[in-house]
């Protein structure tokens, strides 16, 4: 436990931020899981809509500083490859 007043405040804000980040990351993972399910079912129209939603959430993660630019770029690339391979 921290003894310094400022460190106690920082610990509180860090915990609040951590909880927001965990919640946000969970919503991104859910969107990607839905996209993967649409890809498995070979439903291209639904997959394109979900791809757009996933892109939106990943880009929002960059602006919120939850994800790095390279992480998002890699995931977007991999997801688009999967969607483009649907026949």
From Swiss-Prot:
Residue stretches of biased makeup (Basic residues): 7-20
Top-rank taxon, per record: Bacteria
Residue ranges of the region described as Disordered: 1-21
GO biological process: translation
Gene Ontology CC entries for this record: cytosol; small ribosomal subunit
Keyword Ribosomal protein assigned: yes
Keyword Ribonucleoprotein applies: yes
InterPro entries found in the cross-reference section: Ribosomal_bS20, Ribosomal_bS20_sf
MF terms in GO: small ribosomal subunit rRNA binding; structural constituent of ribosome
Sorted UniProt keywords: Ribonucleoprotein, Ribosomal protein, RNA-binding, rRNA-binding
Disulfide bonds: none
HAMAP family listed in its UniProt record: Ribosomal_bS20
PANTHER family, per database record: 30S RIBOSOMAL PROTEIN S20, SMALL RIBOSOMAL SUBUNIT PROTEIN BS20C
Function: Binds directly to 16S ribosomal RNA.
Similarity comment: Belongs to the bacterial ribosomal protein bS20 family.
Name of the protein in its database record: Small ribosomal subunit protein bS20
Gene: rpsT
